[in-house]
Design a protein with these regions (language model features):
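Membrane-proximal interfacial segments on either side of biological membranes
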Residues: 1-300
Length: 300
């Protein structure tokens, strides 16, 4: 399902011109007990008039299946909405991957390397549960130009149960949109994950035109929901932007946003048309999926 969403695969996919080298063993011919040991091959993938090539090697061990594949993609587009990435049609690209699957049906993506022109996405030790949710990962590297023609250079690296997020440039607009819409049905991570992301990014776009500089701090998740945050950054004119999230003893999530330069925030979220200057102080208290918010606008 995960690869179907990335590659936009549908029921019209056909596999042809396949060459296979199969190794197997039989413990009893009378019982027709045949065990696949390995499979090596290459095929062409054909869908809606588009043709691409895949080479693969599959091995079946005691309690584990391992797959190594190289996919050459030219015709087919690739879209990753969460990070605003798109590979257009008729652009040479490749995906190299190695994954293992165990008897519990969880999948470990040992390595994925995607390359297309000057774009590269790298994932290491990404573990996916049988429900298609992410359990954890070791490293993610993003180096690409997105659909908004903005450069992205970001590294997310595991540190025990937490993650360190560093980079020079990143367009966070789609992740912000996703966070505002997130619910229990579309969570990326497994429900019992408790993680802290320590952030240090030089330049973060909140939309195509507006950005903040030197974003530092941390955000924390409890049971896959944001429950703590302490982030500070600066707009290009030097004005500070602060975001704080805390969980009270009554299980209330209190969110506070403060800045003396509200124009980019107002443009991004359309709080009040025409409001450009002054002080923006936003506070929200959420409990049991019910939010009560107060927006204070002063000195404008």
């Amino acid at each position: 399902k995960l690869f179907n969403e990335i590659l936009n695969v549908n029921n019209n996919l056909e596999i042809f011109d396949t060459n296979l080298d199969i190794t197997y063993e039989t413990s009893s011919l009378k019982q027709n007990n045949i065990k696949l040991l390995s499979l090596n091959g290459n095929s062409y993938l054909f869908e809606n008039g588009q043709k691409d090539k895949i080479q693969y090697q599959l091995t079946n061990q005691e309690n584990k299946v391992e797959l190594i594949a190289n996919i050459n993609i030219y015709s087919k587009p690739i879209l990753l909405n969460l990070i605003n990435f798109e590979k257009k049609e008729n652009v040479n690209s490749s995906i190299k991957l190695k994954l293992t699957s165990n008897k519990n049906r969880s999948i470990l993506l040992n390595k994925i390397i995607f390359k297309s022109k000057n774009d590269e996405i790298y994932l290491e030790d990404l573990r996916i549960k049988s429900n298609n949710q992410i359990e954890n990962f070791k490293k993610i590297e993003l180096n690409f130009t997105d659909k908004s023609n903005l450069q992205n250079n970001l590294v997310v690296k595991a540190q025990k149960k937490n993650y360190l997020v560093t980079g020079s440039k990143f367009n966070a607009s789609k992740i912000i949109d996703h966070s505002l819409k997130i619910n229990s049905k579309n969570n990326l991570f497994v429900s019992d994950n408790n993680n802290i992301f320590k952030i240090n990014i030089e330049k973060v776009y909140i939309d195509k035109k507006n950005y903040i500089k030197n974003l530092k701090g941390d955000i924390g998740f409890k049971n896959n929901k944001l429950n703590t945050a302490n982030l500070i950054s600066f707009f290009p004119n030097g004005e500070k932007f602060e975001l704080n999230v805390n969980e009270t003893q009554n299980n209330e999530i209190v969110t506070q946003i403060f800045t003396r330069y509200p124009k980019p925030i107002v443009q991004r979220y359309k709080f009040i048309d025409g409001f450009d200057e002054g002080v923006l102080n936003f506070q929200s208290v959420k409990k049991d999926n019910i939010s009560n918010s107060v927006l204070i606008i002063d000195n404008f």
